[in-house]
Amino acid sequence: MNLIYLTMRFSLNEKNYFCYMRNIFLILLLPIYSISQSLYNPQLLYDNPGGIFDEDSLRSIYLDFYNPNYHNYLINSWYYNPSERIPAILTLNGNQLDSVAVRYKGNSTFCLPNDVQNVKVPYNIDMNYYIDDQQLLGYNKIKLANAWMDPTFLKQIISSNIYRKYLPTGESNLVKLYAQGNYVGLYVNDESIN
């Protein structure tokens, strides 16, 4: 018994004692730390998707215009008064926003598809143009690009992910767009940078 006491007395000098106590403390914290950790579960991405720019979910945006002749009106507005917007009801995941302001955007991405009478033109949607402080999942404005000449629909999303590693960059993802209840097509949803 005295031999064990002497061995501990000589081996536990002040420096060793500190290391010994630190290790005991860390061992005692290990169960607490382990309980607080969560395992990665990819199913959570589908059960609880993130914000409006979540790349792991394909959302559907429904635009219901008050003007049934909205397409021709927006085309004329694009040529004669490009900043003019018309009101519509936007629905996303059951959330409905009344009186969002919609206009067509783009130049070549607007003109070229429109030359072949394609209704898949790019959109600029402003949530708080008519109603102050109205937001869609925390955003005031979104831009829906038609990915003209990009059959993969990935150019904007991949470049955004690369740029984001080095620069402050807007987010992008894909959405399905319906106008007046009719499927218009797959769009690239770009964050509007003010």
Residue ranges and their predicted role:
Residues 1-4, 29:
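Selective for proline/serine-rich intrinsically disordered segments
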Residues 15, 21-23:
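Positively charged n-region of N-terminal signal peptides that target proteins for export
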Residues 37-194:
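Phosphate/dinucleotide-binding and metal-coordinating scaffold of catalytic cores
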Residues 23-32:
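Sec-dependent N-terminal signal peptides
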Residues 3-6, 12:
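Short hydrophobic targeting helices and cationic amphipathic motifs
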Residues 9-10, 32:
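Short, low-complexity, intrinsically disordered N-terminal modules
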